[in-house]
């Protein structure tokens, strides 16, 4: 009887051990098997205005009202009436909205940080923000900020403690976090805006891929293992791009989008998809997800009325009337001198939830939510994994 009891106890212990190991593996973000949610403790984002939650506003002055009116009730560093796709990503993962790394007031970095700034590009711009509108915070600068953030946050976290442990991430979060990238749009548009030909614009794409690869590998070298990489959207459907280069507005598709702009965006995306596949082979211990936001955005624009939206090329927060309700010299919240008085003329439309374009460059919150809903389940991703399972997207 004693021998039987011992055997039974041993069997139970073995079963419990196996169950414990299985549970531990299931809860590890680093597990590569098909399984449950990844439980990312933080998100670190790199990008441009499509995901900027306050970087440029912290540097050069806040995005003015009516930006932020729909969700935040006030300007919140976003060039939008409300939330961006990156905000919906954070919410979906059960995390707080990301604070901009450059914002020194009221920020909390416990669950990540945002290095994106509006106007940023992969390559450094050979001009200034005030001349071109493009940010000096290129992708390599964003990575330098990220390195500084790791080093300085952990120095303070470990040596000062106290309140700092409530606003800074744990050291292990840097290897467990999801790293998101949404950048490249400004490299294409800025090249066109200096009157380059399509052939000249296309010629920079290989260099963009090399630079992007280098930065992603640098993030990998600092512990990053889970990457969620957005492609660029249909640039030929952005009113500001069409006004900057009206010669490229024709030929247009049935929606009024520039065929030329969009073909270059599609070429960029093709090369980006190849780049992500190459990274996947180079680093088989990491998870790289390529996310096709182009398809989500073009679906919204080309089927706007069917999906409950108004004219997708008509700017909500703009000025000037005309085809796009956009004057390039007057942005959203912008002012003009009227009879010697400075008057706000860049006003919001009555119902932003019915519009796709917020300010001629960026989407409304409603449009961003549509895009997020299209990508969150993984139907537009390669590999086709959901956001919450992006730690499982390893491939050969």
From Swiss-Prot:
Keyword Glycoprotein annotated: yes
GO cellular component: extracellular region
Glycosylation: residue positions: 108, 126, 151, 196, 339
Principal place of residence: secreted
Catalytic residues in the record: 49 (nucleophile), 359, 362
Keywords: Glycoprotein, Hydrolase, Lipid degradation, Lipid metabolism, Secreted, Serine esterase, Signal
Keyword DNA damage assigned: no
Coiled-coil intervals: none
Compartments reported by the entry: Secreted
UniProt-listed GO biological process terms: acetylcholine catabolic process; lipid catabolic process
EC number in record: 3.1.1.-
Gene3D superfamilies: SGNH hydrolase (3.40.50.1110)
Leader sequence residues: 1-31
A molecular function (GO) term: carboxylic ester hydrolase activity
Role this protein plays: Esterase that can hydrolyze acetylthiocholine and propionylthiocholine in vitro. Substrate preference is propionylthiocholine > acetylthiocholine. Possesses extremely low activity against butyrylthiocholine.
Family under the similarity heading: Belongs to the 'GDSL' lipolytic enzyme family.
Protein's recorded name: GDSL esterase/lipase ACHE
Origin species: Zea mays (Maize)
Lineage: Eukaryota, Viridiplantae, Streptophyta, Embryophyta, Tracheophyta
């Amino acid at each position: 009887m004693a021998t039987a009891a011992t055997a039974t106890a041993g069997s139970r212990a073995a079963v419990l051990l196996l169950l414990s190991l299985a549970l531990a593996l299931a809860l590890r973000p680093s597990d590569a098997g098909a399984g449950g949610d990844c439980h990312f403790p933080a998100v670190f984002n790199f990008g441009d205005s499509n995901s900027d939650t306050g970087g440029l506003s912290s540097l050069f002055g806040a995005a003015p009202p009516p930006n932020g009116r729909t969700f935040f009730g006030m300007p919140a560093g976003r060039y939008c009436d409300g939330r961006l796709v990156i905000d919906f990503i954070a919410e979906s993962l059960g995390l707080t909205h990301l604070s901009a790394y450059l914002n020194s007031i009221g920020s909390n970095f416990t669950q990540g940080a945002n290095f994106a700034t509006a106007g940023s590009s992969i390559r450094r711009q050979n001009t200034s923000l005030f001349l071109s509108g493009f940010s000096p915070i290129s992708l390599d600068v964003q990575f330098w900020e990220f390195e500084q953030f790791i080093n300085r946050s952990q120095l303070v976290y470990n040596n000062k403690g106290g309140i700092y442990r409530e606003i800074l991430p744990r050291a292990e979060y840097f290897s467990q976090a999801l790293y998101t990238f949404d950048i490249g749009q400004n490299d294409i548009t800025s090249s066109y805006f200096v009157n380059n030909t399509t052939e000249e614009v296309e010629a920079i794409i290989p260099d963009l891929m090399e630079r992007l690869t280098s930065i992603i590998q640098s993030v990998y070298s600092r512990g990053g293992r889970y990457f969620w990489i957005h492609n660029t959207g249909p640039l030929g459907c952005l009113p500001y791009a069409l006004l900057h280069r009206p010669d490229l507005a024709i030929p247009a598709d049935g929606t009024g989008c520039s065929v030329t702009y969009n073909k270059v965006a599609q070429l960029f995306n093709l090369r980006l998809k190849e780049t992500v596949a190459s990274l996947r082979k180079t680093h088989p211990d990491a998870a790289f997800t390529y996310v096709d936001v182009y398809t989500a955005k073009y679906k919204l624009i080309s089927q706007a009325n069917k999906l409950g939206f108004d004219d997708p090329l008509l700017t909500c927060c703009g000025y000037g009337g005309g085809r796009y309700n956009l004057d390039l010299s007057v942005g959203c919240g912008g002012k003009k001198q009227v009879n010697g008085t400075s008057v706000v003329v860049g006003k919001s439309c009555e119902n932003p939830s019915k519009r796709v374009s917020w300010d001629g460059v960026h989407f409304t919150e409603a449009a961003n939510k549509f895009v997020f809903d299209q990508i969150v389940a993984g139907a537009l991703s390669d590999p086709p994994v959901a956001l919450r399972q992006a730690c499982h997207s390893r491939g050969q």
